[in-house]
């Protein structure tokens, strides 16, 4: 057998088709035709030629959704971290046992907040400290903020890194292969 050099034009076309993932798509399609053995292979190829591209588009859309969700998480964390800790300082945290039915919860929170304010005022008077009341701040507002902060339990590392997002998960692959049938 003699060795034939690869025609440069052929090699250029092959690289072009590989770059556009055309060869990969066609190979997968031909493998499915061989496995399923449809009655009319040409119709099957015509109907399923864009499925691989659809899967790629779906994967890109999911990556964009993940990125938007991560940005939203970062934005909300900044808001939570931006809450003035001085406003919340000295108030008793709302325990999960104190959370009652929705109609009773505001009263319980308000009562515990008032008790905490009285304790704080007594401590300040004993220590000789005086604090001016803030006119725009009511005990209900403070109680609401305290309850909201206590209810927000953000995990430390819940944001998916870009490297993790770049790896397709087995469930996405299974879903994509299951939808093409």
Curated annotation (Swiss-Prot):
MF terms in GO: transcription coactivator activity
Low complexity compositional bias, start-end: 111-127
Signal peptide: none
UniProt keyword annotations, A-Z: Nucleus
UniProt cross-references to InterPro entries, sorted A to Z: AMY1
Keyword Metal-binding: no
GO biological process, one term: regulation of DNA-templated transcription
Subcellular localization(s) per the UniProt record: Nucleus
Lineage: superkingdom: Eukaryota
Gene Ontology cellular-component annotations: nucleus
Major location (coarse): nucleus
Feature: compositional bias, Polar residues: 168-181
Keyword NAD: no
Region listing for Disordered, in residue ranges: 111-145, 159-181
Recorded family membership: Belongs to the AMY1 family.
PANTHER family cross-referenced by the UniProt entry: ASSOCIATE OF C-MYC AMY-1, C-MYC-BINDING PROTEIN
Protein name: c-Myc-binding protein homolog
Organism: Drosophila melanogaster
């Amino acid at each position: 057998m003699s060795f034939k050099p690869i025609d440069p034009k052929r090699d250029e076309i092959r690289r072009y088709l590989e770059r556009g993932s055309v060869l990969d798509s066609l190979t997968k399609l031909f493998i499915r035709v061989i496995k399923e053995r449809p009655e009319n292979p040409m119709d099957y190829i015509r109907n399923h030629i864009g499925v691989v591209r659809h899967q790629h588009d779906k994967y890109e859309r999911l990556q964009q959704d993940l990125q938007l969700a991560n940005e939203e998480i970062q934005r909300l964390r900044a808001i939570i971290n931006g809450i003035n800790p001085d406003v919340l300082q000295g108030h008793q945290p709302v325990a999960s046992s104190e959370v009652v039915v929705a109609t009773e919860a505001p009263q319980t929170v308000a009562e515990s907040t008032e008790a905490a304010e009285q304790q704080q005022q007594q401590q300040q008077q004993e220590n000789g400290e005086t604090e001016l009341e803030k006119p725009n701040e009511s005990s209900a507002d403070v109680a609401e903020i305290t309850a909201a902060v206590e209810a927000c339990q953000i995990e430390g590392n819940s944001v998916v890194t870009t490297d993790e997002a770049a790896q397709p998960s087995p469930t996405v692959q299974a879903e994509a292969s299951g939808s093409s049938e």
